[in-house]
Amino acid sequence: GDTPEPGSDTVRALAHALNYPTEFFYLSDSEALGTEAVSFRSLSSLTARQRDAALAAGDLAFELHGWVAERFELPAAQLLDLRDEDPIAAAEALRSHWGMGAKPIEHMIKLLESKGVRVFSLAEQHKHVDAFSCWRGNTPYIFLNTFKSAERSRFDAAHELAHLVLHIHGMTNGGRDIEREADMFASAFLINRGDLIGHLGRVNSLARLVSAKKRWGVSVS
């Protein structure tokens, strides 16, 4: 038979324990997120249970976003459709569109959120998932594994941004060419080519290499 609805006392207890508003638990269910719409980089290595759990986390994020969006004015998506662009040219085009110039990105997550990307952190039970992204209507989402170094998380965010602009609504879940394109985009987006060339001549020691790493927020390797 049908699953019984939890009582009001149970809902209030859940809301208190999870620090969610009580009304959130009375939202109607939205359409479930399917694997075909998601940029699962490590899909082939995930078990069905791990994949379904990550998708369920995405569904929960959609519900939460819907509740927040009804009550607060959130930035509209300011992404470009760059499906026909070379990954490096696409990264430069998006930096230009966002008026970023050549300067390093101080805070990747804040940048994405200011441009209308909804960014969510995956809970510890999903740490086997690198990261994933998808479009929900006209709203782009990125889900990050935050149990990594700050540099790795920045790169993951830029990699998923690549999927959102290069592979819009056409995710192929881990194809090598798709992932290589996303990596190329991420590298070019995080480190502007002109800024890199301007600093390469000064990076002639390990100390300067570490300084360059701090400048761009990327791994030395």
Language-model segments: what does each one mean?
Residues 1-221:
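Short juxta-domain linker segments that transition from a proline/glycine-rich
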